């Protein structure tokens, strides 16, 4: 499990987890590629109190340090990411490559005080069972540490209902 405290509102931590547009720029070579910055269109469905949406995009590279994903090539197979946003601050993310191999992420952000939160991320997968858990844990540590500056710099600190009042910094 990855646990990270942030000097931000929980809404900003969730916003960051669901923003695939920052992957090529903040996580190049790990979650995205600056040569493929476009985010595919996705439709959001509301079922009860849960928001559902999914995207299909070219896969990111596996690296020697982090052989995390089930793909063997960079672009094919494509990765399907299926998100469920459970309000107020919980996400279930399922990753698949069109076969039986898959990953699941459970992420929740706990408000600690005004503009302070704690994020918890649990990851599971049904492949590479011989690989030490520390590989995924270190990968998530790198990703969360790369996101820290982005999450903590957003103004206003809480995601507003009127997004035109947002100043987004990178």
Per-range role (PLM):
Residues 4-170:
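C-terminal catalytic domain of Rieske-type non-heme iron oxygenases
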